[in-house]
């Protein structure tokens, strides 16, 4: 397999989608690949024709695309482009893309990430059979909507 062909293929991916682009002329400036001669993995056709590229855009759950999840927060998305000229053998070009999985913090009772939603102070972790602590506010503010000019704007004048 020619190195130039591998450089003619680019892949971008997310946790759910794979986007692959292949140059229309991957071998040299005189040889075009016809749109009907290439497919992604399980005979999935080109989804978009660009000026200089063919594009394949598919969810990772289709077209025989493989998703390998590692114990870290990394995934590998694997596929291949099949190129079959009319009367010749089939050529397979590997497609590999890596993506970091998003790691969302666990949502806690009445707050997120261990902070109370109202006071932004840490909530102690509760153990089994223990009640959740009731959030408390240390100070109450009321808004004063009297007219003020720009120079008077301060925390004291707005919140009394």
Swiss-Prot record:
Subcellular location: Secreted
Listed transmembrane segments: none
Signal peptide location: 1-13
Domain of life: Eukaryota
Keywords: Secreted, Signal
Coiled-coil region: none
A GO cellular-component term linked to this record: extracellular region
UniProt similarity note: Belongs to the PLAC1 family.
Protein name: Oocyte-secreted protein 4B
């Amino acid at each position: 397999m020619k190195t130039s062909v591998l450089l003619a293929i680019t892949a971008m991916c997310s946790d759910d989608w794979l986007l692959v682009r292949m140059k229309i002329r991957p071998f040299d400036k005189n040889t075009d690949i016809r749109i009907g001669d290439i497919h992604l993995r399980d005979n999935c056709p080109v989804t978009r024709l660009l000026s200089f590229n063919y594009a394949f855009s598919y969810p990772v759950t289709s077209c025989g695309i493989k998703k390998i999840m590692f114990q870290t927060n990394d995934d590998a998305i694997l596929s291949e482009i099949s190129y079959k000229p009319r009367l010749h053998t089939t050529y397979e070009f590997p497609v590999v893309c890596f993506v970091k999985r998003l790691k969302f913090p666990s949502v806690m009772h009445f707050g997120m990430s261990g902070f109370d939603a109202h006071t932004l102070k840490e909530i102690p972790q509760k153990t089994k059979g223990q009640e959740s602590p009731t959030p408390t506010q240390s100070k109450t503010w009321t808004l004063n909507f009297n007219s003020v000019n720009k120079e008077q704007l301060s925390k004291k004048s707005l919140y009394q």
